[in-house]
């Protein structure tokens, strides 16, 4: 009976290992399509548009035992290569720049967060929203 239990345990662990090695349970860092919002205080509408952003899982390590060392920096999914695109906000009064520029992810990588080009916060309870009335249905990549 003990040998049967050992064999069953070995079988379960080996099958579980094969299943787990097929790939990560979380999607890795990569470009994905996302809908964002653009507005200007001087313009009457908000535009939602679709672009490519970096999102996904980056492997990280956390110390299990307390140490006198500072915490290890945690990598984030951030831009590797990008280009900038622009959209024009309709209905802006004369003298107000109606153009809004935004990054388009071409490729992504796991690395330190650069506040100059990335939002390093965690997931949001609500997606980015507009204060002005929306003008939906535009698609830009």
Swiss-Prot record:
Disulfide bonds join 29-77, 43-92, 46-130, 54-108, 58-110, 113-120. Residues 1-20 form the signal peptide. Gene3D superfamilies: Cystine-knot cytokines. It is found in: Secreted. GO terms for cellular component: cytoplasm; extracellular space. It comes from the Eukaryota. Keywords: Disulfide bond, Glycoprotein, Hormone, Secreted, Signal. PANTHER family: GLYCOPROTEIN HORMONE BETA CHAIN, LUTROPIN SUBUNIT BETA. Heterodimer of a common alpha chain and a unique beta chain which confers biological specificity to thyrotropin, lutropin, follitropin and gonadotropin. This is Lutropin subunit beta. It comes from Ceratotherium simum (White rhinoceros).
